[in-house]
Amino acid sequence: MQTEIDASVIVKEKEWLETNVLPEFWESMSEGLKEALNLISSDDPTVLVFTSPKTDAVKGIVSRSSSNVVRVNVTAKVGRTTHVLKLKDSAIIHLDQILNLSNYMHYALYCLPRLRHNTERAIKELQEILHAIVCLLHSIMQEESEKEEIPSNASSISLKSQNSIVSRTSNPFSCLNHSPRQIHKTVRNHLFSPPLPSNLALSFSISNASVCLHLFRLSGPNEVLESFAKNSVDIEMLKPFVSQRIDAFSQDPILLAVTAKLSALQKKVNDVSYRFKTISSSLYGAK
């Protein structure tokens, strides 16, 4: 008799959650995703200042608009030589991490109305998508070669001391079976004016709500370096030829706001998931 009463109470609690909590939850998830998507998709340029307070290795300005870098005007000292890194006026650099981030948010918004009838599946799907997004925003490009670490107005990251993080985030899509491996590529040298010399390679990534600039000095056969300079290549291909690496980081206020919103949404999903799992396990135990 007591078991039947307990089961009845648990069923009523589950019904109350579905009636009073879930509608507001779905609405807040949809609104939060739309707000984050609008922020990250804005075409208004975000100007990022790269400075090196302890050294003068890297200094200048980078502008991001939506998922593209649209302006680069940076000076970099590599060895004894100072290079001017200036993106051509008509050129853009695609930030694949931000493009993937936008795609995931579009996918989440697409799934929400189609999965709401199946609470357990919808919550699980949202957990996976949001986990992938948060991993994507915190992914760190692995570094195995010698580099010079450059701080900026955002805290610099010691990549060699982050191996445990890299192992979890070098593939930020691993929690979704259909997702590809994140690949970091170089920028074609001819997109700059003047073009970068063939012994230099430049790449951008996103980490900890910052835009990260990675500059590589290369050594090797001229034909290999010329091939790298003409193409956008996977950073992994450069590693045998890297003699120096310089990293600079500048925190992006829009990425910071998006990260905060998505982290809050992730917490909401986890809280609702925990409540339903608790009710389900209690209901099972009462039978």
UniProtKB/Swiss-Prot annotation:
Superkingdom classification of source: Eukaryota
Pfam families: Rogdi_lz (PF10259)
Phenotype upon gene inactivation: Leads to mild sensitivity to a range of drugs including doxorubicin, cycloheximide, and bleomycine, as well as to calcium.
Matches recorded under InterPro entries: RAVE2/Rogdi (IPR028241)
Keywords: Cytoplasm, Nucleus
Subcellular location as annotated: Cytoplasm; Nucleus
Main localisation: cytoplasm
Nucleus listed as a keyword: yes
Keyword Nucleus: yes
GO biological process: cellular response to calcium ion; vacuolar proton-transporting V-type ATPase complex assembly
Cellular component GO terms, alphabetical: cytosol; nucleus; RAVE complex
Record note on quaternary structure: Component of the RAVE complex composed of rav1, rav2 and skp1.
Physiological role: Component of the RAVE complex which is required for stable assembly of the vacuolar ATPase complex V-ATPase.
The protein's name: Regulator of V-ATPase in vacuolar membrane protein 2
Native organism: Schizosaccharomyces pombe (strain 972 / ATCC 24843) (Fission yeast)
Gene symbol of the encoding locus: rav2
